[in-house]
């Protein structure tokens, strides 16, 4: 009886070990076996909680990064637009009043005209909006402005007083009127003008009119040299006819000049 009992125990042990090995082979690599799940029943829940906390922590970071990315764009949109670099024109404004003057802007804020062009008369006209321009002195780095009293002066900062309305006249000249200041009762515009001596006129003066020569300015800008439009045509060369061959004339032997004999006449008398 003891031997048979031992044999039964040995066979049952072999069967149990074989069954355990078969379950291990059938189970996938990522999932633990039944023994592991029984030993650590809270493993899956802990992993789920850790993954949820990771996603929750990543969400505010992503939102903060998105906010930081959107920040510069919003600040650029809110920044004020001064003028377009593509609309700049550099040159001088020539007024044909009197002997003719070039509008010039001084660093100390003075504005007048000079008969001969110089560094102070180099101006930069840029577009602010449709029909509205600003005038800046390149050398003085100040903007042309008109005060409430109609006086022309130079301003270090670009303000509403520096905005002028540019109009093209029929005689190819331009007029520049203040975009803000004008006569309240009649609505007459105040224009940039020079007198016969080259001094700046007040825009509020009743004599300053768009029909007067003192308000007419001719823009003289540097134009880029346009490339010469040229093309080449290939003409087939005409073959020249061959030169006619001259017949060869046989050279004759040089003739010998005959010997000349001189005779002296002798006269005998008696």
From Swiss-Prot:
<comment type="subunit">
    <text>Interacts with FGFR1 and FGFR2. Affinity between fibroblast growth factors (FGFs) and their receptors is increased by heparan sulfate glycosaminoglycans that function as coreceptors.</text>
</comment>
<feature type="compositionally biased region" description="Low complexity">
    <location>
        <begin position="41"/>
        <end position="69"/>
    </location>
</feature>
<feature type="compositionally biased region" description="Polar residues">
    <location>
        <begin position="76"/>
        <end position="86"/>
    </location>
</feature>
<dbReference type="InterPro" id="IPR008996">
    <property type="entry name" value="IL1/FGF"/>
</dbReference>
<dbReference type="GO" id="GO:0043410">
    <property type="term" value="P:positive regulation of MAPK cascade"/>
</dbReference>
<feature type="region of interest" description="Disordered">
    <location>
        <begin position="237"/>
        <end position="257"/>
    </location>
</feature>
<protein>
    <recommendedName>
        <fullName>Fibroblast growth factor 5</fullName>
    </recommendedName>
</protein>
<keyword id="KW-0325">Glycoprotein</keyword>
<dbReference type="GO" id="GO:0005104">
    <property type="term" value="F:fibroblast growth factor receptor binding"/>
</dbReference>
<dbReference type="GO" id="GO:0008083">
    <property type="term" value="F:growth factor activity"/>
</dbReference>
<keyword id="KW-0964">Secreted</keyword>
<keyword id="KW-0732">Signal</keyword>
<feature type="glycosylation site" description="N-linked (GlcNAc...) asparagine">
    <location>
        <position position="112"/>
    </location>
</feature>
<dbReference type="Pfam" id="PF00167">
    <property type="entry name" value="FGF"/>
</dbReference>
<feature type="region of interest" description="Disordered">
    <location>
        <begin position="25"/>
        <end position="86"/>
    </location>
</feature>
<comment type="function">
    <text>Plays an important role in the regulation of cell proliferation and cell differentiation. Required for normal regulation of the hair growth cycle. Functions as an inhibitor of hair elongation by promoting progression from anagen, the growth phase of the hair follicle, into catagen the apoptosis-induced regression phase.</text>
</comment>
<dbReference type="GO" id="GO:0022008">
    <property type="term" value="P:neurogenesis"/>
</dbReference>
<dbReference type="GO" id="GO:0005737">
    <property type="term" value="C:cytoplasm"/>
</dbReference>
<dbReference type="GO" id="GO:0051781">
    <property type="term" value="P:positive regulation of cell division"/>
</dbReference>
<feature type="signal peptide">
    <location>
        <begin position="1"/>
        <end position="20"/>
    </location>
</feature>
<dbReference type="GO" id="GO:0005615">
    <property type="term" value="C:extracellular space"/>
</dbReference>
<keyword id="KW-0497">Mitogen</keyword>
<comment type="similarity">
    <text>Belongs to the heparin-binding growth factors family.</text>
</comment>
<dbReference type="InterPro" id="IPR002209">
    <property type="entry name" value="Fibroblast_GF_fam"/>
</dbReference>
<dbReference type="GO" id="GO:0008284">
    <property type="term" value="P:positive regulation of cell population proliferation"/>
</dbReference>
<dbReference type="GO" id="GO:0008543">
    <property type="term" value="P:fibroblast growth factor receptor signaling pathway"/>
</dbReference>
<keyword id="KW-0339">Growth factor</keyword>
<dbReference type="GO" id="GO:0030334">
    <property type="term" value="P:regulation of cell migration"/>
</dbReference>
